[in-house]
Amino acid sequence: MFLELINFITQFDTKFNVLNYLTIRALLAMLSALFIGLMLGRIFIKRLQQCHINQVIRTDGPKSHLIKVGTPTMGGILILFAFIVSILIWGDWSNIYLWIIIVTSIIFSAIGFTDDYLKIKHKSSNGLSSSIKFLTQSLSAIVISTWIILISQKTTQPQLLIPFFNDIILPLSVFDFLILSYFVIVGSSNAVNLTDGLDGLAIMSVILISGALAIFAYFSGNYNFSNYLNMPYITGINELFIICAALIGSSLGFLWFNAYPAEIFMGDVGSLSLGAILAVIAILIRQEILLFIMGGVFVAETLSVIIQVGYYKLYKKRIFLMTPLHHHFEKQNISEPKIIVRFWIVTLILVLIGLASIKIH
């Protein structure tokens, strides 16, 4: 929207063309999203409290979580509002990648919103049934993956890049790409959802990973950089640089209120959509495996649940004291802030490892 205005004004005064630069628009997108989050955060929290939209705390969970009773939830609405408004202001409306991200945000936030609503309505930690949630996520992922395939065929051949091994590129058929995209989207969406159990834990991981994906998007959308770094050049993909910046800004605005002790939780409306957004960005820039590496905390949280359930069904015993993984450490009497910061550190290290692949490329 603002881009059209800039182009119009530039016809009369070329000095305004600086606002058309990708880096400037990205900075403004991040600051705008952050400003919206900070300005509306307190108002939004009070409104949620007035409407009694509070997090339902599991009675079988860590006893330390009982003090969180009454904390407002569905803060993901604030994150997504700041995010979408920001990219609509500073993004290029003619860029198809912008609309893919917006549609992804809306679809998965709708699933999460429904889940949160049912939990609050029935005052239970159970919202949508597992089968319905999985079905809606699956259908959404297939639709989005198909859309990406149709777009990708016009730009580059579907392929799977192997980080740190620039001479290994696996060509993918349309069916292969569809299956890969499906699992990345559904897996990432649920992984962030499982990780969102401690104050600020999931959102900081989203911020760090978004920063790394922004760098990859910037390089992949620049012919000279992508050629020098032996990365696939994808026309127009650098618009994701602005989208990642807006995601960082909106997430920071939310973290301001979600940091320990949290004044608000993002709920499924936030976690399911944020996970899907990260997945779609990674798919678009051909960095699916890097998302798996950089999102190692998300992966560990998910695997802990899968292993716990599978092992218990086979042997009627538990490997972990409680899952997801962060609850296991809570059961060991490690304080919540310490667990959170340690998980942040792990994510930071994994993100740096992911960024190191650029140089190795």
UniProtKB/Swiss-Prot annotation:
This entry's Gene Ontology molecular function terms read:
metal ion binding; phospho-N-acetylmuramoyl-pentapeptide-transferase activity; UDP-N-acetylmuramoyl-L-alanyl-D-glutamyl-meso-2,6-diaminopimelyl-D-alanyl-D-alanine:undecaprenyl-phosphate transferase activity
Record Pfam families: Glycos_transf_4, MraY_sig1
Reaction(s) catalysed by this chain, per the record, are: UDP-N-acetyl-alpha-D-muramoyl-L-alanyl-gamma-D-glutamyl-meso-2,6-diaminopimeloyl-D-alanyl-D-alanine + di-trans,octa-cis-undecaprenyl phosphate = di-trans,octa-cis-undecaprenyl diphospho-N-acetyl-alpha-D-muramoyl-L-alanyl-D-glutamyl-meso-2,6-diaminopimeloyl-D-alanyl-D-alanine + UMP
A GO biological process of this protein is:
cell division
Membrane topology, record value: Multi-pass membrane protein
Q: Which UniProt keywords apply?
A: Cell cycle, Cell division, Cell inner membrane, Cell membrane, Cell shape, Cell wall biogenesis/degradation, Magnesium, Membrane, Metal-binding, Peptidoglycan synthesis, Transferase, Transmembrane, Transmembrane helix
Cofactor(s) listed in the protein's UniProt record: Mg(2+)
Name the domain of life.
Bacteria
List locations, semicolon-separated.
Cell inner membrane
Can you tell me where the transmembrane regions are? 21-41, 69-89, 93-113, 131-151, 168-188, 200-220, 240-260, 264-284, 289-309, 338-358
Q: Name one GO cellular component term.
A: plasma membrane
Q: What is its EC number?
A: 2.7.8.13
Q: In which pathway does it act?
A: Cell wall biogenesis; peptidoglycan biosynthesis
UniProt cross-references to InterPro entries, sorted A to Z: Glycosyl_transferase_4, PNAcMuramoyl-5peptid_Trfase, PNAcMuramoyl-5peptid_Trfase_CS
Family stated for the protein in its record: Belongs to the glycosyltransferase 4 family. MraY subfamily.
Protein purpose: Catalyzes the initial step of the lipid cycle reactions in the biosynthesis of the cell wall peptidoglycan: transfers peptidoglycan precursor phospho-MurNAc-pentapeptide from UDP-MurNAc-pentapeptide onto the lipid carrier undecaprenyl phosphate, yielding undecaprenyl-pyrophosphoryl-MurNAc-pentapeptide, known as lipid I.
Protein name per Swiss-Prot or TrEMBL: Phospho-N-acetylmuramoyl-pentapeptide-transferase
Q: Which organism is it from?
A: Vesicomyosocius okutanii subsp. Calyptogena okutanii (strain HA)
